[in-house]
Structures are given as C-alpha cells and as structure tokens.
Design a protein with these regions (language model features):
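An alpha-helical, amphipathic repeat domain used for nucleic-acid recognition
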Residues: 1-117
Length: 117
C-alpha cells in the first residue's frame, strides 16, 4: 500500500489517502510519530499499527474530555468508551493509562461520592 497524499483537513487533523481510494484521518502527532508522508509504502501491519495508535489517541483524548466535566468510576468510563469504540482491548489499554496516570481512581471516586451524601 502506498500513501498517495497527506493534506491538512481540520485543525490538527490530516486526511491521508492510501492507494488513491482509502481515506483515513490522523492527528498531526500520529503523522509525525509514524513518519506518514506522501510516497511512503506501508504493509498491512504498519497500517494497522498507525490506525491503532490513532484510535488509542482518540479514545484517550475523549476520556480526558469527559473527565473535565465530572469524575467517573473505572466501570463507568470503560463502558462509556466501549459504547463508542467497540474494542475491549483498546478500551482496556486506555483505562490502564488513565489509572496509571491517576485520572481514574475508584477509591477517590467513592470518597467524593460519599461526601456528597
């Protein structure tokens, strides 16, 4: 597979055309991290890796956006992400990063919920 073109789409999102037929939309960070540019040859494994990274980034950013408005328990956030992204593996990896960075903490969530009562 060959990347035919990479064009700015909206904001920090780029439209990447593969083999002049398939379009995917990637964040500028993914473009830079995976050296995505016109003329690059990709095998199926490399494309899957890029798409996985893009989906992971989207899901993680979505979770951070949701956490701006209120706290979520692990189960609530996992189910919210699963409803949108449909991949248990992806949602599990996002939850692992959220908990390791301290954004999701069931103990803290329970303590705050108890204080509200």
């Amino acid at each position: 597979m060959k990347i035919t073109s990479v064009k700015k789409y909206k904001g920090t999102t780029y439209e990447v055309v593969i083999d002049e037929e398939r379009k995917i939309y990637l964040h500028a960070d993914i473009i830079a991290d995976y050296s995505v540019f016109a003329g690059t040859e990709l095998d199926t494994a490399a494309l899957r890796k890029i798409i996985w990274a893009s989906n992971f980034r989207r899901a993680y950013q979505r979770a951070l956006f949701l956490l701006d408005y209120r706290d979520y328990s692990y189960a609530e956030m996992y189910n919210k992400l699963l409803g949108t992204y449909k991949s248990e593996r992806l949602c599990g990896e996002v939850m692992k990063k959220l908990t390791s960075n301290g954004f999701i903490d069931d103990r803290r969530y329970a303590e705050r919920a108890a204080r509200k009562l």
